[in-house]
Amino acid sequence: MKFQPLGERVLVERLEEENKTSSGIIIPDNAKEKPLMGVVKAVSHKISEGCKCVKEGDVIAFGKYKGTEIVLDGTEYMVLELEDILGIVNAGSCCHANSHDHKDHKHAEACCHDHKKH
């Protein structure tokens, strides 16, 4: 099933939590906390055509009580507002991480860094 987030939202699949502690103790499913990181599976048109700071495939960190959980085809996802994303794991700058040129920005003023500095 295809899902297209609206507004400034992203669809995220949570990363799996470890089943063992560092000392080897197995953690039962009901005792695990849900991870606060996930992989972006879809972004809204407003983000993909605007700031482009988050794209499909990015690993992001988000707040503990943020987003809305949904189930699509038996898989759990989170729908998060752009402002609820704390950061991108191993990210470069917006333009260079997304392989586009400054001249290609239609909405440079909405981007997450100052184009005049580059």
UniProtKB/Swiss-Prot annotation:
Domain of life: Bacteria
Keyword annotations of the record: Chaperone, Cytoplasm
InterPro entries membership: Chaperonin_GroES, Chaperonin_GroES_sf, Chaprnonin_Cpn10_CS, GroES-like_sf
One GO BP: chaperone cofactor-dependent protein refolding
A single MF term (Gene Ontology): metal ion binding
SMART domains the record matches: Cpn10
A GO-annotated cellular component: cytoplasm
Localisation per UniProt entry: Cytoplasm
SUPFAM superfamilies associated with the record: GroES-like
Stated family: Belongs to the GroES chaperonin family.
PANTHER family documented for this protein: 10 KDA HEAT SHOCK PROTEIN, CO-CHAPERONIN GROES
Function statement: Together with the chaperonin GroEL, plays an essential role in assisting protein folding. The GroEL-GroES system forms a nano-cage that allows encapsulation of the non-native substrate proteins and provides a physical environment optimized to promote and accelerate protein folding. GroES binds to the apical surface of the GroEL ring, thereby capping the opening of the GroEL channel.
Subunit structure: Heptamer of 7 subunits arranged in a ring. Interacts with the chaperonin GroEL.
Listed name of the protein: Co-chaperonin GroES
Gene: groES
